[in-house]
Amino acid sequence: TDRIYPIADVLFSGPMKRCLETAQILYPGQTPICIPEWTEMDFGAFEGHNYQELSGDPAYQRWIDSGGTLPFPEGESREEFIRRNVAGYEKMLCYMKMILERSAASEQGDYNTGSEKTELERSDEIGAQDAGIQSVSAVVHGGTIMALLSHFLGEQYFNYQVKCGQGYSGRLVFLAGGGTPEWKEFRPLSEFTKGETY
């Protein structure tokens, strides 16, 4: 690829084939940790249809007139989609906590090498714990980007719309004493230079 993407010590991905294949192209040799909640929105009765096929459908016109806020017939609402993606983000944070704890325990010689292993340990999906984690990447659908950023940054959902191969980078700050980590210093990936970490 000619595009520039940040390096990733840990790689996450949505579970759909497009995300997994893209993750392998952008990060060859790394196996992403799949977050099942990061699938595309359920378009219900509109799934697989284009604008021409749906024009004239009263349900589609109601959805358009709502600015995309109504639920898709037999599908998800935007709010449901955002909640699902936020649940996936929280799962990603749990994985990160597990990875960091495992790394710290390994440094202290306390790492469990017995048969009682977590799903993450069994899958052997992480490769950079020993060197420390400096950067994490997630290969996801544009809708997941819009859902998560609008939820956490409070701006309009469509303000974060991206084209294929585009995305954002930011710094996640973990607060002393726990609590919800805060996102800082967002910028589009197009502002990166090759091999830069964030």
What is the predicted role of each segment?
Residues 17-19, 88, 144-145:
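Alpha-helix capping/helix-boundary segments
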Residues 25, 147-151:
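Active-site signature of alpha/beta-hydrolase-fold catalytic machinery across serine-
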Residues 44-52, 94, 98-103, 109-114, ...:
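Acidic, low-complexity terminal tails and accessory targeting/binding regions
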Residues 2, 82, 86-97, 101:
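Generic structural signal for well-ordered alpha-helical scaffold segments
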Residues 26-86, 198:
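Phosphate-handling substructures
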Residues 13-14, 83, 139-140:
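Short beta-strand scaffold positions
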Residues 9, 133-142:
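Generic beta-sheet signal
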Residues 1-30:
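Active-site-proximal alpha-helix that buttresses catalytic centers in soluble enzyme cores
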